[in-house]
Amino acid sequence: MAEGAALRALRGCLAAFPREARELGSLESIPYLDRPPSPLEFYREWDRFVMPEERQMPFMDFLDIVEKKVTSPNIFYVQKQCSNLTEEFSELVCDVQPDIPWMSEALGKKPDAVNFWLGESAAVTSLHKDHYENLYCVISGEKYFLLHPPSDRPFIPYELYQPATYQVSEDGSFQIVDEKSADKVPWIPLDPLNPNLEQYPEYAQAKPLQCTVKAGEMLYLPSLWFHHVQQSHGCIAVNYWYDMEYDLKYSYYQLVDRLTKIVGVL
């Protein structure tokens, strides 16, 4: 009964969002994006960690692509991890809560960032973790999460990659350009939906959780939890990042992480 009441309370919190915020797909309620979008999606091309190309375009043009009014072979995703809702979509700030009051009260702080997400179904966020307490609110569509608790760290591989960026050439094709002066990036090489257990046999011991977050629902994603994210086409979401406390939980994770690295070297 208590869990059911809590779930109803969360849904009620999201249901209180104004209709304009829940129906951002209507052209009248969409502002223009006047800065380059910065997707979270990272691409792994063999031995490189390739950041996506960033493109400046009117937001209306982006919507035409998502709604298939314009054909494009590329994958488009609007996301920038620096509170882009408040920085780039100021017209919508009054339509979405600036924070989640009960979470702010529980943590004794306001969110560091409020992020806006909108993209195609082909845009996938690879497995990673964040140093934030994350409240993920789906306004339209669905998000599909695959989750690992921090205790699964010994079974999750990391490798070092040469950082690079996709750039568009004059003929419209993409080329990968290395960032030669940058240090190599540690990243998870494994696709949790289709893991190569011959190459990474330890992952077979991990216990992934999967959940679907539907419109009007909210997911609390604790800091340091690994997550891989997919979405339905045109899914609209807002998430709230609260900085984590670097307390005993963080120290425990650091211990597990370092022991995992030591064992991997031996």
Regions found by a protein language model. Give the residues of each.
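N-terminal accessory scaffold of Fe(II)-dependent oxygenases
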Residues: A2-M218, F226-L266
